Amino acid sequence: IEMGDVWGNNSVLSSIGPGGVFAEAYACVPGEPLMVNVTAAEDTRALLLNIRRVLEPCANVCPRHVRLVRNLLTLCSEKNLQLSRRVLHTGPKSIRKRLLSYFSECIKRTGSYSFDIPYNRQQLADYLSVERSALSNELSLMQRDGLIRYEKNHFDVMEQIDS
């Protein structure tokens, strides 16, 4: 999911895997202009839901309907947390601190200092709101300094880093 401005600059907001949900906030706020673009990286099928029918339960209040609403609320909450984390990662002024913030989240999420990320270099640069060449340069410097090792989207972060 990307957000683009009128000058053609894109910023990656998130990525979605199989079974993921997108644009639910727009569906729940009628008339809100769509500010994001969704691009599939592979063949994809999408299920479109009539949000009005989802949010107005039937007279029987069937368990499946309640479960659907609960699942959508959970997904919205998870997405809110994901966007909040992105704000935290793009807050630091230096690219290194943005990377360390993102890596810290990855370590906490996976429970390991060795992890894969769901982005290529351009997508990671967009996610962190930095230029790709500057990001690649900083990753090289961090590897040279012995802070990280990486190959493509796999990273090994050293356990002791003085930020």
Where are the regions that the model predicts?
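Cytochrome P450 core scaffold surrounding the K-helix E-X-X-R motif
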Residues: 1-8
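Cyclic-nucleotide recognition modules
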Residues: 12-70
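Short hydrophobic/aromatic patches on the structural cores and recognition surfaces of FHA
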Residues: 19, 38, 80, 99, ...
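Long cytosolic regulatory regions associated with cyclic-nucleotide signaling
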Residues: 25-26, 71-79, 93-95, 138, ...
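Inter-domain helical "communication" segments and dimerization helices
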Residues: 58, 62-69, 74-88
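Short, Lys/Arg-enriched, Trp-marked, Pro/Gly-tolerant hinge/linker segments that flank
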Residues: 83-95, 110-116
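Phosphate-/nucleic-acid-contacting segments
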Residues: 98, 102-163
